[in-house]
Amino acid sequence: ENPFAGLGKSGKLTLHNRKKAYQLAGESCVLLKNEKLLPLSMKKKVIWAGPYTASRELLSRWSIFGEHEAVETIEDVLQKKQIEAECITGCNILSDEECKVWQVEQELSDKPRDEQWLETITHEDTVVCVLGEHESQSGEAASRAFLTLPEEQQVLFEKIAERTSNIVTVVITGRPLDLRRISERSKAVIMAWRPGTMGAEAIIDLVYGRINPSGKLAVSIPWCVGQVPISYWDVKTGHVLTADNLENRFTSRYMDIPNTPLYPFGFGLSYTEFDVSDVEVRMEQDKRVHVHCKVSNTGNIAGAEVVQCYYETLHASVVRPMKELVRFQKVFLDPGEKKDVDFFIDQEEFSYYGK
């Protein structure tokens, strides 16, 4: 068998394929938090910090034949675009001890690691921290008990956070992580996943506003590792925690942490604002459920919104999830533009085993 017939080595890194890789990287990044810090102005000098500013390790573990030499680093792209910025690695992706645990070789950087540069950061400075897992820490045969960032990166982040609160954190990862501390001390957080060959350019263009983020989470980001596994479609129980019984101890709840994730499935921010209105649900003559709504861009820049349609089974003969995603549609809108969105759902799609 040859499932990739027609794809030769000469066609892998063409300009067309690079453009597609750039588009996919940009659209898959998820803006998790933004306290009016992003997008950054290119006229303002910014410090880019963290081991991923100088690393080509942006591919996924599943990219077995991926060519790291073809990946540009964030520092490379900043220089190519002539963006005024200072790049400091600060630490390695993994410590020497962590490299032994994960059976990888240390990726040595020729960048100086003198910590005196930290003393030059003032409370007015903006720092973009590019942090994350090593690519060996996700994918097959990479189970983890703790989902925090590697230790040296945590230390680096805390030292930066002691100097300034104007922090944008870009997270490179192949799985959900425990990002609570990062989120608490960052004014903006971008989940970049493992963005691939053109990931560095996509991240930079997103930070500076050339790309308006439109990605949504395909997983839930836990409030802490104790919530794992956590899913938006967790099944109902006989003692569901609701807004009406928050003081009732005898509900399905954690006593010391929230029940809800830090960032839920389907979540993702934009640099513009959207409004979904005029929602209608009706049964068509062919027995399909028709869901209609209008979505409008109420902000000042063009953007894309992913309209998501969920349903809940109120009564069933077996335990059903709290809610289930049944349809979604990505809608591109200019400022002030409004569009109709229609979903048609067959009745069979509401069926389940055991009925």
Where are these regions (language model features)?
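An anion/phosphate-binding loop that grips the pyrophosphate of nucleotide cofactors and donors
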Residues: E124
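Short, hydrophobic/aromatic beta-strand segments
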Residues: A302-C309, R320-P321, Y353-K355
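Glycine/threonine-rich flexible loop motifs
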Residues: E57-S60, L131-E151
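Secreted, periplasmic, or luminal enzymes acting at the cell surface/secretory milieu
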Residues: E1-W62, G66-I74, Q79-K81, S95-V101, ...
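Intrinsically disordered, low-complexity Pro/Gly/Ser/Thr-rich segments with frequent PxxP/GP/PP motifs
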Residues: S317-Y353
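Conserved SGNH/GDSL esterase-like catalytic core that processes O-acyl groups on lipids
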Residues: D76-W117
